[in-house]
């Protein structure tokens, strides 16, 4: 039996990051977590590109353009959608998740989902670096692992 696994060796890896500006008090913490992890795992600063978009809904388009450019081994998508009193939350969450997943499938580039979808600001804060860890950091680790997994499968 042959088992494929990705590791956290970040040699010659280029990463694109798409960050939503809406709820920036949360998304900036997600970005800081991602950047800290990438640097800790020895991804060079010149091998990281960050694109800011207005809101979570715009993330899939820029993630798709980055993935199709073939300049990045993985894309990390960061945003925060917090439930309000209208159905807008449901539409945004559904479309963003579909768009991100479709980008990965269409391009073969790992596209990591670091978009928080929470019922409250408190839940978002917890997932951006307090009680529940930092989703940006988790996505950075996942990006490195997925790049190496794909490389190990390219026989």
From Swiss-Prot:
Question: Tell me, what is one Gene Ontology molecular-function annotation carried by this entry?
Answer: 6,7-dimethyl-8-ribityllumazine synthase activity
Catalysed reactions, as listed in the record: (2S)-2-hydroxy-3-oxobutyl phosphate + 5-amino-6-(D-ribitylamino)uracil = 6,7-dimethyl-8-(1-D-ribityl)lumazine + phosphate + 2 H2O + H(+)
Q: Where does (2S)-2-hydroxy-3-oxobutyl phosphate bind?
A: 85-86, 127
Keyword Transferase recorded? yes
- Provide the alphabetized UniProt keywords: Riboflavin biosynthesis, Transferase
A Pfam entry, by short name:
DMRL_synthase
Functional pathway: Cofactor biosynthesis; riboflavin biosynthesis; riboflavin from 2-hydroxy-3-oxobutyl phosphate and 5-amino-6-(D-ribitylamino)uracil: step 1/2
The residues listed in the UniProt record as binding 5-amino-6-(D-ribitylamino)uracil, with positions renumbered to this chain, are 22, 56-58, 80-82, 113
Q: Which GO terms describe its cellular component?
A: cytosol; riboflavin synthase complex
Q: InterPro entries attached here?
A: LS, LS/RS, LS/RS_sf
Which residues are the active-site ones?
88
Q: What does the entry give for GO biological process?
A: riboflavin biosynthetic process
**Might you give the EC number(s) for this enzyme?**
2.5.1.78
Q: Give the Gene3D superfamilies listed for this entry.
A: Lumazine/riboflavin synthase (3.40.50.960)
Q: Which family does it belong to?
A: Belongs to the DMRL synthase family.
Q: Which PANTHER family match?
A: 6,7-DIMETHYL-8-RIBITYLLUMAZINE SYNTHASE, 6,7-DIMETHYL-8-RIBITYLLUMAZINE SYNTHASE DMRL SYNTHASE LUMAZINE SYNTHASE
- Please give the function described in this protein's UniProt entry: Catalyzes the formation of 6,7-dimethyl-8-ribityllumazine by condensation of 5-amino-6-(D-ribitylamino)uracil with 3,4-dihydroxy-2-butanone 4-phosphate. This is the penultimate step in the biosynthesis of riboflavin.
The name under which this protein is listed is 6,7-dimethyl-8-ribityllumazine synthase
Provide the organism lineage as a comma list.
Answer: Bacteria, Bacillati, Actinomycetota, Actinomycetes, Bifidobacteriales
């Amino acid at each position: 039996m042959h088992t494929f696994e990705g590791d956290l060796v970040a040699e010659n890896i280029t990463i694109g990051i798409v960050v939503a500006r809406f709820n920036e008090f949360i998304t900036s913490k997600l970005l800081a977590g991602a950047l800290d992890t990438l640097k800790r795992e020895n991804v060079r600063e010149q091998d990281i590109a960050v694109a800011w978009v207005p809101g979570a809904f715009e993330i899939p388009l820029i993630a798709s353009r980055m993935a199709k450019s073939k300049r990045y081994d993985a894309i990390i998508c960061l945003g925060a959608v917090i439930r309000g009193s209208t159905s807008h939350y449901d539409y945004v969450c559904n479309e963003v998740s579909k768009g991100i997943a479709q980008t990965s499938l269409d391009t073969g580039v790992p596209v990591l989902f670091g978009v928080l979808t929470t019922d409250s600001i408190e839940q978002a804060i917890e997932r951006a670096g307090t009680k529940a860890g930092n989703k940006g950091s988790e996505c950075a680790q996942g990006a490195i692992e997925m790049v190496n997994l794909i490389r190990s499968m390219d026989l």
